[in-house]
Amino acid sequence: MEIIFILILIAAAIIIEYFSYMRNGRKGLSYRAEIGRSEVFEGDEVILTEVIVNDKLLPLPFVKTEIVAPAFLDFGIKAEKNKEGICCIPSVFSIKGREKCRRVRKIKCTCRGIFEIGASSLYGSDLFGLGEFIIPVTDAKVSLTVLPSPLSADDFSPDNRQLYGDILVRRFICEDPFLINGAHEYSGREPMNSISWNASARAGKLMAVNRDYTSCSKMIILLNFQRRDDIVAPATEEVCELMIKAAAFVMEMAEEMKAEFALVINIPDQEPLTAGSGAGFRLEQLRRLAAVEADCYLRIEDFIMEQPVGEFTDVILITPTLSFESTDRLEDFKNQGLGVHAYAMHNESDADFCSQITRRVKEDI
């Protein structure tokens, strides 16, 4: 009789617990995700913090979330991905009443892009797994922008780093106060700060420096994903990613040399042509590259010829394959007095102004 009474008490306790969790399990339970940095480069690590708050006295022995994130983000654990390239990373919590729980994860960003990370729902239950409940989570996702990392000079053959920046011209309005080309005898009309004391000591008389005239370089960067001239389709994903990294490399060089540049991409819905310089403008263009989807809009020759190159001093072409036709178009620009350079995986025309990208990929072109 005592055993039956004990079993009845246990059953009653389980039923009470079941209804308590079914009625009150959802109350006062919240989830949010926080990210250390919202903008990083490829290869960087970022901290993701999950925060669950149980704002009631009833403890929650089992709460489960699933972080939904692209497979390009490495959480350090194995997770299966679906056909869309999305993986789910489970997290299990046990929370006391009136308690906040934090879980910190390190994420390695292996590919550029703009991603959303976070849980879509919370799943919880009582101690026996009977009183189950699900809470949809809204506004719990965070956005992460992964900027493309530039190639290095070692990824090109030959290592042809053109010195973009100030270029010599024959006539200009003002002298360049920083560029010196020889010295001449001081006539008394030059300012005192133009006297070269080293040259004066060697010549035995006052000598003033000669200053050159310069003009700032302004380049247009043409980014093309077309596989070949006869195939109006983008190259493989790996090759297109290399093209984006090469564009990031050229923009980095332009910033180092204080040169003004504009980035034009051969894709549909191209943004209006805008030139600029400096770290801020380069960051804007890197954000464009982070969001771009490799595609083809025009044939490479048409893409090159429709650009207003007359507004620039240099033309930089980045393409999977530099063909004879593309080389002829660039040679025309060269004959017009423009600086010309190309970066390509394959240099079919053996153009001397082309640097070949030597980094290996699994699927070429």
Regions found by a protein language model. Name each.
Residues 1-29, 47, 288-365:
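Von Willebrand factor type A / integrin I
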Residues 13-272:
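An amphipathic, basic-hydrophobic helix/alpha-beta surface used to engage anionic
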Residues 265-290:
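Short beta-strand-loop
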Residues 93, 144, 275-278, 359-365:
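Generic detection of short hydrophobic beta-strand segments and adjacent strand-loop junctions
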Residues 217, 222, 238, 279-287, ...:
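Generic alpha-helical secondary structure signal
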Residues 70-72, 98, 149, 173, ...:
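Short, structured coil/loop segments at alpha-helix boundaries
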Residues 1, 62, 172, 209, ...:
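Intrinsic-disorder/low-complexity, polar/charged segments
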